[in-house]
């Protein structure tokens, strides 16, 4: 069995019979996937927010609200939220800040420390690849230049 709290992993497993429910579930899956593609984190939050928007939107439409008016209101709210988030965002610059942020995201400070070390070695333009291993523990392997895997 797989144990996860990742929104994308959970969303991928949802299969519904009802065609209308299936469309809604696919919409939420797309929200989680886009969030993962763009941010790499926050998929559970995005999924919960999408579900709340759909629930409240349907409730308002059932109560007689204009669907286009709701859409315009949501778009204005998204603009304001985005603006506010960008104003409150802080640059993560130091190795310690990277380690703290990565540790929170990974749910494990030792992973955060390893990511910070990797970022320190490759710089902002470098590529970091995370792979599963048959061995126990964490390790950092640095490849300078280019690496081509067979295939």
Swiss-Prot record:
Membrane-spanning residues: none
Binding positions (ATP): 41-45
Primary residence: cytoplasm
EC number: 5.6.1.7
Enzyme class: isomerase
Localization per record: Cytoplasm
Recorded GO MF terms: ATP binding; ATP-dependent protein folding chaperone; isomerase activity
GO-annotated cellular components: cytoplasm
Reactions this protein catalyses: ATP + H2O + a folded polypeptide = ADP + phosphate + an unfolded polypeptide
BP GO terms, sorted: protein refolding
Sorted UniProt keywords: ATP-binding, Chaperone, Cytoplasm, Isomerase, Nucleotide-binding, Stress response
Nucleotide-binding keyword on record: yes
InterPro entries: Chaperone_TCP-1, Cpn60/GroEL, Cpn60/GroEL/TCP-1, GROEL-like_equatorial_sf, TCP-1-like_intermed_sf
Database matches in Pfam families: Cpn60_TCP1 (PF00118)
Superkingdom classification of source: Bacteria
Family: Belongs to the chaperonin (HSP60) family.
Record's function text: Together with its co-chaperonin GroES, plays an essential role in assisting protein folding. The GroEL-GroES system forms a nano-cage that allows encapsulation of the non-native substrate proteins and provides a physical environment optimized to promote and accelerate protein folding.
SUBUNIT field: Forms a cylinder of 14 subunits composed of two heptameric rings stacked back-to-back. Interacts with the co-chaperonin GroES.
PANTHER family with a match to the protein in the record: 60 KDA HEAT SHOCK PROTEIN, MITOCHONDRIAL
Official protein name in the record: Chaperonin GroEL
């Amino acid at each position: 069995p797989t144990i996860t709290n990742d929104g994308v992993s959970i969303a991928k497993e949802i299969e519904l019979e009802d065609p209308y429910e299936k469309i809604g579930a696919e919409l939420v899956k797309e929200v989680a996937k886009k969030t993962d593609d763009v941010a790499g984190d926050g998929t559970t939050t995005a999924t919960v927010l999408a579900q709340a928007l759909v629930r409240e939107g349907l409730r308002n439409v059932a109560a007689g609200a204009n669907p286009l008016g709701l859409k315009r209101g949501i778009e204005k709210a998204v603009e304001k939220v985005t603006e506010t988030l960008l104003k409150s965002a802080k640059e993560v610059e130091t190795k310690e800040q990277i380690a703290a942020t990565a540790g929170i995201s990974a749910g494990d400070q030792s992973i955060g420390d390893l990511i910070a070390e990797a970022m320190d070695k490759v710089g902002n333009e470098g590529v970091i690849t995370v792979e599963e291993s048959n061995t126990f523990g964490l390790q950092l392997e640095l490849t300078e230049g280019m690496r081509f895997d067979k295939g």
